[in-house]
Design a protein with these regions (language model features):
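A charged alpha-helical hairpin associated with nucleic-acid processing machineries
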Residues: 42-51, 78-94, 99-249
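Phosphate-handling DNA/RNA-contact segment within nucleic-acid enzymes
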Residues: 1-90, 94, 108
Length: 249
């Protein structure tokens, strides 16, 4: 045990209006480095070679009680590089479970590019309106829950494309922004073959030529490489200065 974490069941409870209440950060507890449920889930994740990602504590507890153990929670925060590496130690496959809150989904998908950057296979499953993983798990056993996921989960890039297309409608400016958004997600994927597959599929969905997306992805990757090189150089100079200061003292 490294900290306490709680879910506020009524936003008006004693004036508390936040969704989750956690212990303050300490020498042993850094929220960005923890995944709720990982200790109990890791064996099931390895065995099934898949991890389910949910938002909160009650989602994990109810899914465990229903018989689904390969599940962890980000505790209401965007995934951090440390959390992603923790999951990636056990599997390359993740399914993110969302409730029907469109605003929440759009906010959450912004952080999934980091999973793609790690080369992970990401899928998304949207639960029925009015349900979250907690309530859905309390209504269904593990077989029914797993069957629903298998039937409704979608590849992340395809899910993101359809979600943003619905939001953009026929607005040309929004559609241009949509293309830029998708290009950014595809560009961080390390495997060239996977990028090529996504480019072809997105080109069909967006009714644009493959070569346009190929060109834009190449530009983004070049920019990313330049930024990484600059960061490496900054770190090298910082290390040199630190070493010189140590020698001087």
């Amino acid at each position: 045990v490294v900290a306490f974490g709680g879910r506020v069941l009524a936003s008006a409870t004693k004036g508390v209006k936040v969704k989750y209440v956690n212990s303050p950060e300490s020498e042993i507890y850094h929220k960005s480095n923890e995944l709720y449920g990982i200790y109990f889930a890791k064996q099931a994740i390895v065995k099934q070679d898949r991890c389910f990602l949910v938002e909160g504590y009650t989602d994990v507890i109810s899914m465990h009680q229903s018989g689904i153990e390969n599940v962890v929670a980000s505790s209401g925060t965007a995934l951090t590089p440390g959390q992603i590496r923790m999951i990636h130690r056990f599997t390359n496959n993740m399914t993110v479970l969302y409730d029907g809150d469109a605003a929440g989904i759009k906010a959450s998908i912004r952080g999934i590019d980091m999973l793609l950057e790690e080369g992970m296979n990401i899928k998304v499953c949207l639960l029925p309106d009015g349900d979250d993983p907690d309530s859905f798990a309390r209504k269904h056993n593990s077989t029914e829950f797993q069957a629903f996921i298998s039937e409704h989960e979608t590849d992340f890039i395809r899910f993101k494309t359809n979600l943003l297309l619905e939001d953009a409608g026929k607005d040309p400016i929004k559609r241009a922004e949509l293309i830029g958004n998708l290009v950014q997600s595809i560009s961080v994927i390390p495997e060239a073959i996977v990028r090529d597959v996504y480019i072809k599929e997105c080109a069909q969905l967006l009714h644009v030529e493959d070569k346009l997306l190929v060109s834009e992805v190449a530009k983004r990757r070049e920019t990313q490489a330049e930024k990484r090189a600059e960061q490496t150089e900054r770190e090298r100079r910082m290390a040199e200065r630190t070493a010189m200061m140590s020698q001087g003292s």
